[in-house]
Amino acid sequence: SIGVALVIITGGIDLSIGSVVGLVAVVLAFFLKVQGMDPWVAIGLTLCMSLVVGLIHGLLITKAHIQPFVVTLCGLLIYRSLSRWLTDNQSLGPVPLEGDKGYANLDQILGLDFIFSGKIPLGGFNLPTPALFLLVLAIATAIFLRKTIWGRYLYALGNNEDGARYSGIDTDRMKIIANVLCSFFAGIAGILFAFELDSVQPAQTGEFYELYAIAAAVLGGCSLRGGEGSILGVVIAAAVIRLIYNSINMVGISTHLEFGILGMVILLGVIGDEFLKKKMAERQASKA
């Protein structure tokens, strides 16, 4: 959601991140089990792959002048197909399950399993290590957006692209940076999911995650017109969406209605947000 927020702030969209998450998870598992690669090298290569994906998106959008919707929609289909082709649509895990063979560097893999999917005891509470990754990335991204000139450029680009360009901002570079960061964050998520799930399903890992991410970004205050949004709002919205999803399961509502209920809640939240913004604008105009 954080990566998608960066793209949306610039006025773009990314429909491919769910498939990027799935592809990174599959490639990591393939490197570790099939290729017997050193775990740190495998992680480095998969992260580099996610950076290249973002760079390709950015170049197609800025240099080939293809709409972000089209570029990332094609990416969604291509990356999912690659995941299924690479594994012949069979499950593959980065961490060996009972009876699994073919893993080199087993001790390193098990150590990384704790880093990416372990739990740290804090008193009577166990803190999942992925929560630390979320905290670090959220703080770093918030500082990037609010305290650096690059972050202000992203907001300026989303508010008025022509105005930003005429003021001397390299808008193409900023779009590329936003897309690269988005895919990089998706790559980190893919690694975390690979170790958390233990068994990667090429057709299902990351499925619909792009919709959850976009929903969290919009519900968290990012305008699809660009130029608005905060990382804190996005993180809170992502937590609320997960809470709603879990509540639906706990109450015992039919699983066939889960997406419908989630969609209605998000729609009502966005409508309420737009209503409040309109009222605040009218109040400020009346004071002026």
Language model features with spans:
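Single transmembrane alpha-helix segments in multi-pass membrane proteins
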Residues: 1-35, 60-66, 214-217, 221-231, ...
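Hydrophobic core segments of alpha-helical transmembrane domains in multi-pass membrane transport
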Residues: 3-5, 47, 80-83, 133-144, ...
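Membrane-interface helix caps of multi-pass small-molecule transporters
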Residues: 6, 30, 35, 55-63, ...
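Hydrophobic alpha-helical transmembrane segments
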Residues: 19-23, 40-48, 70, 131-136, ...
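Helix-loop-helix "hairpin" substructures at the membrane interface of multi-pass membrane proteins
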Residues: 37-46, 52-57, 61, 122-201
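Transmembrane helix-bundle core of multi-pass membrane transporters
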Residues: 69-147, 176-177, 196-202, 282-288
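Cytosolic-side transmembrane-helix boundaries in multi-pass membrane proteins
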Residues: 159, 166-173, 244-288
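Transmembrane alpha-helical segments in multi-pass inner-membrane proteins
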Residues: 183-186, 196-262
